[in-house]
């Protein structure tokens, strides 16, 4: 005889597979979560267990089997320069190559959301591959790439960085983001008063009014915490070292703590 727990699990799975609002990909994702959360929760110290049960801390619903990290920050520049033996890809020769390589690698970056959380410092990554393209030719490619990200990896946790320097790629990304007004990818502009020209900062401010992005990060402050250019802004309030990451994320419930 099935137990009440087994019956409840089957009912949740049945609701997922028969949902009229979930896509097949979303159904697969939520079914996998049900299987993962059917496993025992990892062992915790008594105080941590109590804090979790009382709602003082939140595990962000990362699942009972943390087999994948929350934040991974690949060295995308190295990948574009050298390619990947594992993926049988050569390094990029031009902007089309670079964009194609990134779209492939993004599907192999592990994360809790099953989508890449960090997309890279895109203007710095892509600018070396522009070669002889005009601004219009760059804009067309970036807009196509931006739309691809939203349609195939539709997750607002997905985060890209630009700045502090100005470049045709930087401007193209700002134009595409303002025009398309997509939820994803999320975007942070890294500002440095010694590097960022005033007219670029003004353009960033106009974009914020137009599409509520990008967020602005203080470059010099982060340079002191990490090394210059050796980090990524991976969410609205998290920065981590490049070629590193973070295994998990725990939030404090300040209201519960105060009570």
Show which residues each predicted segment covers.
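Conserved catalytic cores of very large enzyme subunits
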Residues: 2-259
């Amino acid at each position: 005889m099935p137990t009440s727990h087994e019956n409840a699990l089957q009912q949740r799975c049945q609701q997922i597979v028969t949902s009229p609002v979930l896509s097949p990909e979303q159904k697969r994702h939520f079914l996998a979560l049900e299987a993962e959360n059917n496993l025992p929760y990892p062992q915790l110290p008594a105080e941590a267990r109590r804090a979790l049960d009382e709602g003082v801390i939140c595990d962000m619903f990362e699942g009972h089997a943390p087999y994948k990290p929350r934040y991974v920050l690949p060295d995308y520049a190295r990948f574009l320069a050298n390619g990947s033996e594992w993926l049988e890809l050569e390094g990029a020769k031009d902007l089309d190559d670079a964009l194609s390589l990134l779209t492939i690698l993004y599907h192999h970056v592990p994360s809790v959301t099953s989508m890449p959380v960090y997309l890279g410092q895109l203007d710095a990554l892509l600018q070396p591959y522009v070669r002889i393209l005009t601004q219009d030719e760059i804009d067309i490619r970036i807009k196509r790439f931006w739309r691809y990200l939203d349609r195939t990896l539709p997750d607002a946790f997905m985060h890209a960085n630009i700045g502090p320097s100005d470049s045709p790629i930087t401007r193209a990304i700002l134009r595409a983001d303002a025009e398309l007004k997509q939820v994803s990818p999320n975007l942070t502009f890294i500002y440095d008063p010694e590097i960022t020209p005033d007219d670029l900062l003004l353009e960033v401010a106009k974009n914020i009014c137009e599409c509520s992005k990008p967020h602005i990060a203080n470059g010099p402050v982060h340079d002191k915490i990490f090394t210059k250019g050796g980090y990524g802004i991976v969410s609205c309030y998290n920065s981590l070292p490049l070629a590193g990451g973070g295994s998990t994320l725990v939030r404090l419930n300040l209201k519960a703590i105060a009570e």
